[in-house]
Amino acid sequence: PKTTDVLEHTTFLRYENNKVSDIISVETKDFVKADVKVSYCVDFDTKYMDKWFSVDNYVKYLCDRVRSLMKREAKKYTIEEFYQNYSDIVRNVAIDYQDTASETESGHIGRFFPENGMFIKDCEVLSIRVESDIAEILDEHQKDMVEKSLELTNAESRVKVAEALFE
């Protein structure tokens, strides 16, 4: 996760294609903790150039805001629901998918921060790590579901063959 322990001070701001990585720690509604590793692609809107430096540390600001939103969102799901859909859930929160069906007031698609003209134009969800004992249960459940799905497909195929032979 990002911290302010070691900062690099510079007078240079790259305004396009900034890569910011973070690890977001969340807790689901059934009190299971998970860590999600993400990578954001961030741009700064040139129309907001006068606000680019209004936030002292844009990386910290970005990570803190998205972490807060993500912690609130994760509380809506059980660990099973979250684990199965974490990539979409995290990405939709990070880029503000519900509001990006149309362009934002800045003219860009993505989560926009008017405080400093920054916007997240993409979010890559890299991995999830769940408490080991819970991860084992989830993996076993997933394995059982795949086995049952294959058994069902096999049974349906046999029924179709039997029906075809009967006709």
Question: What is each of the regions a protein language model found here?
Answer:
Residues T4, E8-E167:
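Elongated, amphipathic alpha-helices that form coiled-coils and helical stalk/scaffold elements used
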